[in-house]
């Protein structure tokens, strides 16, 4: 383990992980489209999201100060958790550049500042394409990196497309008064993903190292059409219809991945 940086007072660095997760599907009829929205609304209601974020608090090592949660009408949910740091010495595994735990290996450790999640179900008015977006922000103040929560969160949602941003702001001083604008090594957000996750996604990085800003976009490689069909009406699609639906879905996913409208 590298020698620890001796600080003058508290570590004042703020580390923020922001990411958007998209789940795409095709629902042919208006009835199936509304059923999809209801399904998502029930599957990821405020109570379920609270449990997921509480697990994140354990992963990054935090204490819960307050939880505010809300289910919205007609759809969507939000949860905000305020968290605080304990005076506990971080372990090497909590600060090194490596993947965080998977859902089945969660261990509670120590803690930080706030976590928020918002959900956005959406349906295309004509094409039958339905999108479920989850926006999550994990902001910590101190030595622990919120990137440790990334691996777990991707496995908690049906993630077809993921956009991740990580930035470090502020500075902290060592005992000699020298400023430090980042306190850990990082070359890519991808280093915090497990091997199976890296293998499953096509990934692109845009990093601004001198500004301590890191960006990774992820697109699921494997495409099985049956995993994207929702509702009874999709059970009897003809071969030609299946080809058309697959074309629409792939086009939708590429537009979201590249964040721009593309010609058909």
UniProtKB/Swiss-Prot annotation:
Site (Cleavage (non-hydrolytic)): give the residues.
Answer: 112-113
Which cofactor(s) does the record list?
pyruvate
Q: What is its EC number?
A: 4.1.1.50
* Gene Ontology MF annotations: adenosylmethionine decarboxylase activity
Tell me where in this chain the PTM Pyruvic acid (Ser) is found. Answer: 113
Which EC class, in a word?
A: lyase
Q: InterPro entries per the record?
A: AdoMetDC_fam_prok, S-AdoMet_deCO2ase_bac, S-AdoMet_deCO2ase_core
Report the pathway entry.
Amine and polyamine biosynthesis; S-adenosylmethioninamine biosynthesis; S-adenosylmethioninamine from S-adenosyl-L-methionine: step 1/1
Modification after translation is described as: Is synthesized initially as an inactive proenzyme. Formation of the active enzyme involves a self-maturation process in which the active site pyruvoyl group is generated from an internal serine residue via an autocatalytic post-translational modification. Two non-identical subunits are generated from the proenzyme in this reaction, and the pyruvate is formed at the N-terminus of the alpha chain, which is derived from the carboxyl end of the proenzyme.
Q: Which UniProt keywords apply?
A: Autocatalytic cleavage, Decarboxylase, Lyase, Polyamine biosynthesis, Pyruvate, S-adenosyl-L-methionine, Schiff base, Spermidine biosynthesis, Zymogen
Give the note describing cofactor binding and stoichiometry.
Binds 1 pyruvoyl group covalently per subunit.
Q: What does this protein do?
A: Catalyzes the decarboxylation of S-adenosylmethionine to S-adenosylmethioninamine (dcAdoMet), the propylamine donor required for the synthesis of the polyamines spermine and spermidine from the diamine putrescine.
Q: What is this protein called?
A: S-adenosylmethionine decarboxylase proenzyme
Q: What is the lineage of its organism?
A: Bacteria, Pseudomonadati, Pseudomonadota, Gammaproteobacteria, Pseudomonadales
Query: What is the primary gene name for this protein?
Result: speD
């Amino acid at each position: 383990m590298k020698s620890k940086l001796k600080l003058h007072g508290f570590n004042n660095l703020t580390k923020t992980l922001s990411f958007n997760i998209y789940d795409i599907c095709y629902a042919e009829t208006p009835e199936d489209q509304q059923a999809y929205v209801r399904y998502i609304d029930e599957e990821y209601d405020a109570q379920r999201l609270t449990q997921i974020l509480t697990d994140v608090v354990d992963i990054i090592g935090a204490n819960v100060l307050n939880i505010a949660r809300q289910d919205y009408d007609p759809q969507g949910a939000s949860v905000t958790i305020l968290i605080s740091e304990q005076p506990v010495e971080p372990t090497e595994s909590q600060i090194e550049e490596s993947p965080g735990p998977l859902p089945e290996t969660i261990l509670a450790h120590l803690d930080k500042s706030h976590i928020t999640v918002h959900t956005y179900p959406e349906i295309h008015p004509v094409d039958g394409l339905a999108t479920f977006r989850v926006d999550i922000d994990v902001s910590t103040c101190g030595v622990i990196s919120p990137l440790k929560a990334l691996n777990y969160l991707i496995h908690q949602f049906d993630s077809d497309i993921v956009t991740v941003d990580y930035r470090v702001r502020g500075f902290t001083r060592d005992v000699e008064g020298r400023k430090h604008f980042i306190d850990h090594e990082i070359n890519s957000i991808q280093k915090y993903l497990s091997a199976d996750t890296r293998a499953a996604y096509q990934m692109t990085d845009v990093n601004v190292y001198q500004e301590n800003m890191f960006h990774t976009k992820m697109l699921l490689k494997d495409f099985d059409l049956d995993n994207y069909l929702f509702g009874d009406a999709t059970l009897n699609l003809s071969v030609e219809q299946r080809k058309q639906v697959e074309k629409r879905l792939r086009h939708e996913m590429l537009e979201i991945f590249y964040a721009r409208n593309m010609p058909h």
